[in-house]
């Protein structure tokens, strides 16, 4: 609508102002309102631009290209900032756990073994991967002791120490066997409370994600899994571990697990 040839009484509701008693813009931030007093989400001063909605939504700020694709998006409902045509969360990061068939050569059937985080190495070679029991899920606690699969020096390479609060967005894995006969395999991702300087090293285990059982037919093919995320939020100072289990020992396995997450 144009204001041309209109009376002020006909257009005043469409005029935005700083609600500053006719003193103009100052150093004090003021909410922008329309002529009848309705408030906007915009606040303004001579040095500050501030947005604060009356109700949270998924599109507080949108920057789009000429085709209408979102290039920048502020989501105040979920407290996220996204960018790019794919609307990716801007602080998205990735973490990796892995093992190879050489390390897996000492795995026992139906036992949960923790996998190395990042590019960590083992002080005790293939005897070092910590084991977390034979239950349906890995054990929710872990005690360190001298011996294969229980040393603190073997636990450290499999722990991801979370420095900030994070949210897990997705987990994917690849696995491959080293003989023509495979097994049924399964994997889990857990968080734990870590106690420094104690043999009661891990407690309060929580299932974060898991994959569906893989009926692995052997070394002729590799398998990809897209996991179910069971509990997405992990608080700072927790540790995260990934586990692999096979129901038999027909093959040894190479495994690569990728965790997609963002800071929160």
Regions found by a protein language model. Give the residues of each.
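Intrinsic low-complexity, repeat-rich intrinsically disordered segments enriched
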Residues: 1-112, 123
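Beta-strand signatures of extracellular beta-sandwich domains
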Residues: 62, 186-190
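Terminal (often C-terminal
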Residues: 82-163
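A short beta-strand element within beta-rich, extracytoplasmic domains
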Residues: 165-179
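Extended, low-complexity, turn-rich repeat/linker tracts enriched in Gly/Pro/Ser/Thr and Asp/Glu
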Residues: 175-185, 195-198, 248-252
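Extracellular carbohydrate recognition and processing domains
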Residues: 203-229
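Noncatalytic modules at the cell exterior or secretory-pathway interfaces
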Residues: 229-248
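C-terminal interaction-tip segments
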Residues: 245-264
């Amino acid at each position: 609508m144009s204001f041309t040839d209109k009376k002020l009484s006909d257009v005043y509701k469409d005029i935005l102002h700083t609600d500053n008693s006719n003193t103009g813009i100052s150093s004090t931030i003021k909410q922008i309102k329309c002529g009848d007093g309705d408030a906007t989400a915009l606040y303004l001063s001579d040095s500050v631009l501030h947005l604060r909605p009356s109700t949270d939504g998924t599109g507080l700020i949108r920057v789009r290209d000429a085709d209408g694709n979102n290039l920048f998006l502020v989501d105040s409902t979920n407290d996220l900032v996204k960018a790019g045509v794919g609307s990716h969360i801007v602080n998205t990061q990735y973490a990796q756990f892995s093992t190879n068939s050489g390390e897996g050569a000492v795995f026992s059937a139906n036992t949960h073994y923790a996998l190395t985080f990042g590019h960590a190495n083992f002080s005790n070679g293939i005897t070092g991967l910590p084991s977390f029991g034979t239950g349906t899920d890995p054990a929710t606690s872990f005690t360190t002791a001298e011996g294969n699969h229980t040393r603190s020096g073997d636990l450290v390479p499999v722990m991801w120490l979370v420095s900030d609060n994070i949210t897990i967005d997705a987990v994917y894995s690849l696995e491959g066997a080293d003989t023509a006969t495979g097994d049924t395999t399964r994997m889990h991702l857990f968080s734990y409370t870590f106690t420094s300087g104690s043999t009661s090293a891990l407690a309060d285990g929580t299932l974060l994600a898991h994959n569906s059982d893989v009926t692995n037919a052997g070394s002729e093919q590799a398998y990809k899994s897209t996991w179910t995320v069971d509990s997405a939020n992990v608080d700072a100072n927790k540790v995260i571990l990934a586990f692999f289990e096979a129901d038999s020992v027909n093959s040894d396995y190479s495994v690569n697990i990728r965790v997609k997450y963002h800071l929160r």
